[in-house]
């Protein structure tokens, strides 16, 4: 799904009304109803008892009044707070404010600091706070009572000992977050969940402050999907289930192991044999028909014992226990690579100069699609432009920000300041696909197209997670090929994050192990298939 900026979103709303005859009031009604449903879903089977709906004077506030109307029959106490004088409301927002009052809804006006101070103790003691203050129409920074409200809300404790509020839900976007990707220019509300409408907003995906969004959900309110594609002029897409509907995720009953490719993984060294095991296991669990793990002979027994289902191949070792250059002598490595579908290189191979030369040579000389990660990337530090001289048409590099900084000769801070630009520039420069890992991983193709992934959690911030991702990307390439490689790679990143979510449903993310992420890949894939089936 395309991500839109604020101007594009306004245009979609306008055309939905003018071209397709959907009244703007109906769009607001649908938006508010979705907000109410999201709140109630979050608390099934125990409904929240106290809800505070914070409304600004614009259409975002109007959405909030609609949501309040739908919610009021399901809770013990619900109060709406209007951060404006009623006469400042216009259009659909004014209509829904009146409907809220006519339904018997309670409204507290917040027009001065004293009013906010008096209301705050009650708001701080609610189960749910709905943020309908500013929305996507923000220009400049939040000020006045809204700025104070954001500051106070951000100070609320969210730990197990003081669980209120259980949910802070942003309507369309967190108050204070610009929609077009820039950093917030003032106070920014950090929420548990954001329910946005029609399409994700660019800022929710790529802003340096995007973590404020929490869990992002998108709900349609009546605008045709084709209109989003028509109006959106950018190449930024959100990696969501619909993007993968065209891939053969469900296997044919008469398929066999040869139908799903053969991954060759060059990985591991003394002290880093686990990286090879993790990547190899992930490739198997992610669906590759066959997997061969090529490792230095000194760690071959450990890697062989790590998983019964993959095959292994010994690589000649340096004195340091890493892959030696003499693996290139004769046909030794050529025979190992013969008959394989994809080559994945890098997890745990080490940074010995001789090993790095071996890595550079096999990457530049193979005609197989290549997934290059970890120490494999470090082999090209200071020599990254040589990747353009490779034989294979298909190269995917998977750096974290530090590795990308070394490849591009920039600081990590520079990379993080504009992650999309860094990934797009690298993809163009090396004529490669780039998976720039981190919060909201970027997947960029050499033609400028970009996916942003929002699945995953902080449990992935642990050693071995990248090795698992390498295995997943290689396995999906083996299964689905390179005709739609950007989409296939985006699927891999999506499943990696979704597996982390599945593995931590009943546990804290701090204890998540990379191997547990690998084990949850089938669950993530099943979830995706079922969601696509549900959508029809």
Annotated model-derived regions:
Residues 1-85, 90, 94, 193, ...:
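Small-residue (G/A/S/T)-rich helix-start motifs and N-terminal tracts that mark the onset
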Residues 69-158, 163, 301, 306-317, ...:
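N-terminal small/polar loop signature for handling phosphorylated ligands or for N-terminal nucleophile
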Residues 112-116, 173-179, 202, 376-379:
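Short acidic loop-to-helix transition motifs that present clustered carboxylates
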Residues 127-128, 133-234:
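Internal gly/pro-rich beta-alpha loop/helix module
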């Amino acid at each position: 799904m395309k991500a839109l900026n604020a101007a594009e979103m306004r245009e979609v709303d306008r055309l939905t009304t003018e071209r397709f005859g959907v009244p703007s009031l109906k769009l607001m009604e649908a938006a508010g109803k979705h907000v109410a449903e999201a709140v109630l879903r979050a608390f099934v089977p125990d409904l929240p008892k106290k809800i505070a709906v914070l409304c600004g004077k614009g259409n975002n506030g109007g959405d909030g009044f609609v949501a309040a109307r739908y919610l009021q029959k399901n809770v013990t106490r619900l109060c709406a707070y209007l951060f404006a004088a009623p006469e400042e409301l216009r259009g659909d927002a004014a209509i829904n404010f009146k409907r809220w009052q006519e339904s018997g809804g309670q409204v507290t006006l917040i027009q001065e600091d004293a009013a906010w101070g008096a209301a705050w103790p009650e708001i701080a003691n609610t189960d749910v706070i709905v943020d309908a203050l500013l929305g996507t129409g923000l220009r400049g920074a939040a000020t006045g009572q809204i700025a104070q409200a954001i500051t106070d809300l951000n100070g609320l404790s969210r730990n197990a000992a003081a669980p209120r509020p259980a949910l802070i839900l942003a309507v369309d976007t967190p108050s204070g977050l610009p929609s077009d990707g820039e950093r917030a220019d003032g106070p920014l509300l950090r929420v548990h969940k954001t329910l946005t409408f029609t399409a994700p907003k660019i800022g929710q995906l790529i802003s340096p402050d995007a973590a404020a969004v929490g869990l992002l959900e998108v709900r349609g309110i009546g605008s045709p999907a084709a209109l989003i594609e028509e109006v959106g002029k950018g190449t930024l897409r959100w990696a969501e289930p619909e993007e993968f509907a065209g891939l053969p995720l469900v296997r044919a009953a008469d398929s066999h192991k040869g139908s799903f490719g053969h991954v060759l993984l060059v990985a591991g060294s003394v002290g880093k044999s686990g990286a090879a095991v993790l990547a190899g296991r992930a490739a198997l669990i992610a669906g590759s028909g066959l997997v061969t793990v090529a490792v230095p002979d000194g760690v071959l027994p450990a890697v062989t014992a790590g998983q019964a289902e993959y095959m292994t191949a010994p690589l000649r070792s340096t004195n340091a226990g890493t892959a030696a250059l003499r693996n290139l002598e004769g046909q030794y490595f050529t025979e190992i690579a013969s008959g394989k579908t994809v080559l994945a290189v890098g997890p745990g191979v080490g940074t010995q100069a001789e090993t790095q030369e071996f890595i550079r040579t096999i990457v530049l000389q193979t005609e197989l699609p290549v997934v290059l990660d970890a120490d494999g990337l470090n082999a090209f530090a200071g020599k990254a432009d040589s990747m353009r001289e490779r034989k294979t048409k298909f190269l995917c590099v998977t750096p974290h920000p530090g590795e990308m900084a070394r490849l591009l000769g920039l600081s990590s801070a520079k990379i993080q300041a504009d992650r999309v630009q860094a990934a797009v520039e690298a993809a163009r420069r090396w004529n490669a696909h780039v998976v720039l890992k981190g919060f909201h991983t970027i997947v960029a193709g050499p033609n400028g197209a970009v996916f942003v992934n929002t699945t995953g959690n902080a449990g992935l911030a642990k050693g071995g997670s990248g090795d698992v991702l390498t295995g997943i990307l290689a396995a999906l390439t083996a299964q689905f090929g390179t005709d739609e490689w950007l989409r296939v790679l985006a699927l891999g990143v999506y499943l990696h994050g979704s597996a982390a979510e599945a593995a931590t449903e009943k546990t804290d993310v701090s204890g998540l192990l990379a191997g547990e992420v690998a084990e949850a890949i089938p669950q993530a894939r099943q979830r995706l298939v079922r969601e696509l089936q549900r959508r029809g």
